[in-house]
Structures are given as C-alpha cells and as structure tokens.
Amino acid sequence: EHKVTIKRVNLLKSAVVYGANASGKSNLVEILRFMKYCVLKGIPLEAKQMYCRNKEENAGKESVFEVQIVKHNKFYAYGFSMILSQRAITGEWAYELLSGGDAQMIFEREAGQPPQLGDKINISAADRTKFQIYADDMSDNKNSLFLSEMNRNKNISDHSKLAVFKRIFDWFSNDLVIYSPNTPITNFEYYYDADSLETVNRLIESFDTGISEVRIDKLSMEDISSKLPKEIFMDIVE
C-alpha cells in the first residue's frame, strides 16, 4: 500500500520529483537542508550569498520558507522569512492545520516585535508567563529563530501546551533526514547478509544504473587508499 491515512487525510508514503537538468530538483533538497540547519544550528554565514543574484535589488528582498508536516498525528505548518543578504529574520510562524482547511495559530512573529501566542492556545498561567519572558527576549533578535530558542535549555513539560514547540523542533531534528550523493555509508551491516546483498543486487539491476554487482571483498587500508580518491578515502576512514 503506497498511501497512509491520518485523520481522514490520505498521504503518499513516498514521492518522486522529475525534471530536466538544471530545473531545480536539487534546490528543493537544499532548501530543506537549509531550513533544518537554521532551526538546529542557526543561520549559516553563507546565507548572505544565497539570494538570487541575477538582479542587484534582490539583495534586499525577502525569501520565504515553509513546510507542512505531520507529528504525533497532527498537521502543522511552520515557516520563516528572512533577508538572506543580511541574515535577518523578518517573520516566523507556526499553525496547526485542522480538518476542513482551517488553521489555528500557534504563534506569529514580525521583525522587531516579540512573538505572539495564538488566541486559541489555552495554556496555564505559569506557562503563559514563561512564554512572555521568552518572547520578550526575542524582540530585538533578528538572527535567531524563536522555534530554536524555545528548545534551547527551556524547562517545558511534555504535558504543557507549549510542548508543541518541542514537537515541531523534533521533526527537524529527527524526522527530516537528508541524504546527498556525497553522503558516505556509515553502516555496512546490511551488506554482510547474503539475502540482503542479493536483494540489493536485484534492485540495482532493475534501476538500470550500469552497476552490475555489489559484493563484499576484504581489502587492506593500503589497497583501499590506492583505489579511491583521497577525499572519498578520508570520508570512509572518518
């Protein structure tokens, strides 16, 4: 079965993106990688060069990033906007997506303003005080995401309504896994099983990759280093 149903919403378990060379397929993956990096580690320095540089005025324009996700059988939309050339956050938001096409605001943030909690988020007085303190601290912070700050050494119970910040953050941290052609294999255990290796070879043959066989050979480190480019060998060693 290629579909999964969550709250009467049918979702594909997998999808494939097709397109001509240089049509933007890789950029889709890079955008997701960029969002994950911003949430987990902060805005990278190289973001300054990521805007569309074919026009000079683009340096001052906003770029908008948003994902719709499923976590704990609930649907969320999370996103942020920034002026890439300045590494400056201009907006940030999170909504719970409800049945019937409605959306309930979790929080919104505009440049120079503290984040605002959604009116329908019913939290305790203690949690509301916590949120307000955290939000006020972000008023003039244009280089960090509020989602990141809400997951940095904050004492938020899993039973609190504010735990939604932890759930969305956890999706970026643990559920969004990105592999690129240069990602090294770190676990070869699957290949040491004869049945698994046979399955791998059968799949590779059906993909028409030009690879005829995958097998396990015992080689010395010297043999491996002599057969591979230095950078690939170092990836394997590390």
Which ranges hold each PLM region?
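A broad, low-specificity signal marking well-ordered, structured residues that form hydrophobic/aromatic
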Residues: 9, 15, 65, 145, ...
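Pre-Walker A-like glycine/lysine-rich segment at the N-terminus of P-loop NTPase domains
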Residues: 1-40
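Conserved P-loop NTP-binding catalytic core
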Residues: 10, 29-87
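Electropositive, glycine-dotted interaction segments
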Residues: 77-236
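Short solvent-exposed loop/turn micro-motifs enriched in small/polar/acidic residues
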Residues: 2, 59-62, 100
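Residue-level detector of secondary-structure boundary/capping sites
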Residues: 26, 71, 191-195
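Short amphipathic alpha-helical segments, especially helix-boundary/capping motifs
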Residues: 9-11, 54, 174-180
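A short linear-motif detector with a strong N-terminal bias
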Residues: 14-15, 43-48, 57-60, 124-127, ...
